[in-house]
Amino acid sequence: MALEAWFMDDSNEDQRLPHHRNPKELVSLDYLAELGVLYWKLNPENYENDSELSKIREDRGYDYMDLLDLCPEKVSNYEEKLKNFFTEHIHKDEEIRYCLAGSGYFDVRDKDDRWIRIWMQPGDLIVLPAGIYHRFTLDASNYIKLMRLFVGEPVWTPYNRPQEEHPVRKKYIHGLTYKFGETVKAH
């Protein structure tokens, strides 16, 4: 099954709910790619020996990896951490996440500042470009196991919105204007 993504409603209800508009407005992988979001569907049951994952890591220079179990039983200050993840922010580097178990949502802003909700389920690997406004939350299952990938030493420094003058944000916006200027292989 392919990645599911949609435009979100404006409700302030529980962030762990799907927040579909009525009627639903689904978002294609092509539209996500226009925003710089890349996607691969992999086999989470065999991630340690997955040649496709190894190739992605090699091609993109992802030389550091760790695993993160997010659930109330395994994370101290769980609610506080979720609140931090759900605060809209950017990063200087790509954010690369591979869902191995459970599920959750990455929300990204499109070029018209609308929220798009991306439902991460087992096997989904996404790359969010540096400079894109985004946030993360678990869904109602309250559990996700993610592989985090990095180029070099892991750095996860959020820069909360507004960041319009941040050089990475400016570069991202410039890239949107020029459609990123290169062909990127993902599916």
UniProtKB/Swiss-Prot annotation:
Cofactor remark: Binds either 1 Fe or Ni cation per monomer. Iron-binding promotes an acireductone dioxygenase reaction producing 2-keto-4-methylthiobutyrate, while nickel-binding promotes an acireductone dioxygenase reaction producing 3-(methylsulfanyl)propanoate.
Residues annotated as binding Ni(2+): 89, 91, 95, 134
Reaction catalysed by this enzyme: 1,2-dihydroxy-5-(methylsulfanyl)pent-1-en-3-one + O2 = 4-methylsulfanyl-2-oxobutanoate + formate + 2 H(+); 1,2-dihydroxy-5-(methylsulfanyl)pent-1-en-3-one + O2 = 3-(methylsulfanyl)propanoate + CO + formate + 2 H(+)
Primary residence: cytoplasm
InterPro entries in alphabetical order: ARD, ARD_euk, RmlC-like_jellyroll, RmlC_Cupin_sf
Enzyme class: oxidoreductase
Pathway: Amino-acid biosynthesis; L-methionine biosynthesis via salvage pathway; L-methionine from S-methyl-5-thio-alpha-D-ribose 1-phosphate: step 5/6
Subcellular location: Cytoplasm; Nucleus
Enzyme Commission code: 1.13.11.54, 1.13.11.53
Stated role: Catalyzes 2 different reactions between oxygen and the acireductone 1,2-dihydroxy-3-keto-5-methylthiopentene (DHK-MTPene) depending upon the metal bound in the active site. Fe-containing acireductone dioxygenase (Fe-ARD) produces formate and 2-keto-4-methylthiobutyrate (KMTB), the alpha-ketoacid precursor of methionine in the methionine recycle pathway. Ni-containing acireductone dioxygenase (Ni-ARD) produces methylthiopropionate, carbon monoxide and formate, and does not lie on the methionine recycle pathway.
Designated name of the protein: Acireductone dioxygenase 4
Organism this protein belongs to: Arabidopsis thaliana (Mouse-ear cress)
